[in-house]
Swiss-Prot record:
The lineage of its organism: Eukaryota, Metazoa, Spiralia, Lophotrochozoa, Mollusca. Belongs to the conotoxin D superfamily. The keyword Transcription does not apply. This is Conotoxin Lt28.7. GO terms for cellular component: extracellular region. Contains 5 disulfide bonds. Probable neurotoxin.
Length: 85
């Protein structure tokens, strides 16, 4: 087999081995993608966003239940916001 053909064969097989070793990519979840995008736009960046999901740097009444960080109560397992006026 000529060198060029051998090289092309190796280049074709190498990516298949890499994909097989890593495994298939995880399935795409649109809901997680939307939540992540919304958090990037509106919610306070902190290492663990789970309890702070409702807290925003600005008051956003009616926007996914988000409220300002100053009035957001995250003392329990979930954050609570006072009712919007």
């Amino acid at each position: 087999m000529p060198k060029l053909e051998m090289m092309l064969l190796v280049l074709l097989i190498l990516p298949l081995c890499y994909i097989d070793a890593v495994g298939p990519p995880p399935p795409w979840n649109m809901e997680d993608e939307i939540i992540e995008h919304w958090q990037e736009l509106h919610c306070h960046e902190i290492s663990d966003l789970t309890p702070w999901i409702l807290c925003s740097p600005e008051p956003l009444c009616g926007g996914k239940g988000c409220c300002a960080q100053e009035v957001c109560d995250c003392s329990g397992p979930v954050c609570t916001c006072p009712p919007c006026l």
